[in-house]
């Protein structure tokens, strides 16, 4: 398929260039030409795509006030959106809103365990797991970086679902040739591993993320680039499957499984080829051409393999450092990072949760906020906002600003608590977020109690129009962590955002 430019309604945009055996290249076989075409909005399009609905980007632009537009446009060339808690903070919505002002939105780590829920201009809900949230913005190119583990059946299912709902993906998604392939058997092993751990289970999404990263680290994993060499693909896959069978007696492997998988992946390879690219070269080329790049983090810092509540963590680095290793870009080019944090705290699965509300209050938050996992559907544990953990996340990532989400969920509460200090059993204060899980189980949390506002704030769009108690809550968080809150979510829709 050779498409040079597309036009949606009255706005010309560019999309896929000529496909090539080595990925999506520009008109002269280089990645740089790809960007030149992507930005040529005034040239006559060769293909017209008609739409009966208004452009989401136009609707969004009209919904952003002057101060909001100024906030967005002031973000650095390479910016990022990262989670500040244990995931599910609402990162996808902010990425979706910001994407219109960026040329590229990129995923750098994780896999289909990252569930991002976003809504289009008509209020239709999209649950994405691998495809970057910028896909709903027609002029945005989406990149799945080398640090992501890719389950091809899941990726194709997402693409098919988007296409069926009028969202064009062809020529708008690049998949790194260095990304590792996540197979169905990785998911099976994930379940066997949880059963093996019995009572000490980690509570994974069972999407095969950990086993796939394990294959990567012990160096017998397969990468997207291996799909270009189907002559030796069966031998590599046989080695991987044999290793899994040796490690897990419950995993049954035989010649039929290998034969079936090879046939499946021959078809997958053919379908994936137009999306494959050397994204490391692509991203650095984009940076040198001053293209604006938005990095979308999956999961969150408190699930980081190094900085999270280990071992109750994910298998990648959803912190600032994961941006560089997961995309192949230099630390010096990474600019503003926006941390996304709920106005309260949630967590899915096992692991320490110091500010968890164990009584009916937790249930009230869960149902008011519809706290059920995008990926698993599991009910999330709920608690008060943990300032100690949030300050730790801000320290690690160096956030320029924060997006406080779901402030509207707290509207019916007579009073709201903030967990401001951790104390040892003897009453002495901890100076930092501890790595010791036993200590985390023993600590006592000291709370500040603030008044609630007992009024619906979901239709408010100006910060000064918020109830005084709501503003005091926001400003107290800023005082405690020392990072400004620039975005406040007061509902799930794209327009339900206050720019502060």
UniProtKB/Swiss-Prot annotation:
GO terms for cellular component: chloroplast. Keywords: Chloroplast, GTP-binding, Ligase, Magnesium, Metal-binding, Nucleotide-binding, Plastid, Purine biosynthesis. GO terms for biological process: 'de novo' AMP biosynthetic process; IMP metabolic process. It comes from the Eukaryota. The keyword Magnesium applies. Substrate binds at residues 374-380. IMP binds at residues 88-91, 113-116, 205, 219, 299, 314, 378. GTP binds at residues 87-93, 115-117, 380, 406-408, 489-491. The active site is at 88 (proton acceptor), 116 (proton donor). It comes from Solanum bulbocastanum. GO terms for molecular function: adenylosuccinate synthase activity; GTP binding; magnesium ion binding. InterPro entries: Adenylosuccin_syn_GTP-bd, Adenylosuccin_syn_Lys_AS, Adenylosuccinate_synth_dom1, Adenylosuccinate_synth_dom2, Adenylosuccinate_synth_dom3, Adenylosuccinate_synthetase, P-loop_NTPase. This protein may be expected to contain an N-terminal transit peptide but none has been predicted. It is an enzyme of class 6 (ligase). This is Adenylosuccinate synthetase, chloroplastic. CDD domains: AdSS.
């Amino acid at each position: 398929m050779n498409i040079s430019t597309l036009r949606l309604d009255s706005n010309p945009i560019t999309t896929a260039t000529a496909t090539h055996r080595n990925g999506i290249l520009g008109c002269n076989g280089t990645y740089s030409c790809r960007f030149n075409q992507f930005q040529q909005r005034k040239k006559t399009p060769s293909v017209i795509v008609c739409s009966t609905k208004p452009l989401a980007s136009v609707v969004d632009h009209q919904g952003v006030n002057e101060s909001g537009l100024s906030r967005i446009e002031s973000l650095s060339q390479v910016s990022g959106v990262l989670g500040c808690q244990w995931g599910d903070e609402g990162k996808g919505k902010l990425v979706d809103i910001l994407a219109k002002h960026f040329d590229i939105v990129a995923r750098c780590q994780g896999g289909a365990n990252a569930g991002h829920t976003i809504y289009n201009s008509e209020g239709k809900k999209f649950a994405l797991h691998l495809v970057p949230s910028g896909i709903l913005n027609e002029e945005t190119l989406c990149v799945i970086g080398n640090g992501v583990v890719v389950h091809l059946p899941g990726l194709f299912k997402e693409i098919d679902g988007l296409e069926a709902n009028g969202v064009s993906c062809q020529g708008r998604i690049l998949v790194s040739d260095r990304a590792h392939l996540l197979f169905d058997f990785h998911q099976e092993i994930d379940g066997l591993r949880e059963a093996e751990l019995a009572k000490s289970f980690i509570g994974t999404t069972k999407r095969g993320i950990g086993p796939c990263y394990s294959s990567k680290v012990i160096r017998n994993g397969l990468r997207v680039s291996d799909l270009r060499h189907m002559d030796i693909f069966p031998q590599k896959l046989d080695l991987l499957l044999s290793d899994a069978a040796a490690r897990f007696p419950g995993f049954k492997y035989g010649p039929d499984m290998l034969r079936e998988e090879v046939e499946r992946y021959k078809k997958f390879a053919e379908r994936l080829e137009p999306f494959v690219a050397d994204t490391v070269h692509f991203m650095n080329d984009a940076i040198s051409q001053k293209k604006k790049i938005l990095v979308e983090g999956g999961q969150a810092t408190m699930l980081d393999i190094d900085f999270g509540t280990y071992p109750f963590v994910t298998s990648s680095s959803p912190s600032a450092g994961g941006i560089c290793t997961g995309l192949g870009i230099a630390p010096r080019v990474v600019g503003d990072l926006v941390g996304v944090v709920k106005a309260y705290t949630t967590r899915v699965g096992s692991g320490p949760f110091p500010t968890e509300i164990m009584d009916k209050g937790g249930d009230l938050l869960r149902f008011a906020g519809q706290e059920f996992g995008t990926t698993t559907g599991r009910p999330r544990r709920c608690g008060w906002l943990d300032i100690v953990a949030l300050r730790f996340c801000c320290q690690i990532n160096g956030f320029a600003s924060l997006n406080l989400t779901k402030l509207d969920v707290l509207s019916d509460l007579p009073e709201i608590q903030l967990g401001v200090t951790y104390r040892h059993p003897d009453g002495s204060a901890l100076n930092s977020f501890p790595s010791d899980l036993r200590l985390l189980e023993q600590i006592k949390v000291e709370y500040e109690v603030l008044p609630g506002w007992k009024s619906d704030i979901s239709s408010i769009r100006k910060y000064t129009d918020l109830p005084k108690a709501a503003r005091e809550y926001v400003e107290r968080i800023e005082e405690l962590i020392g990072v400004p809150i620039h975005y406040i979510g007061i509902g799930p829709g794209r327009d339900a955002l206050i720019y502060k």
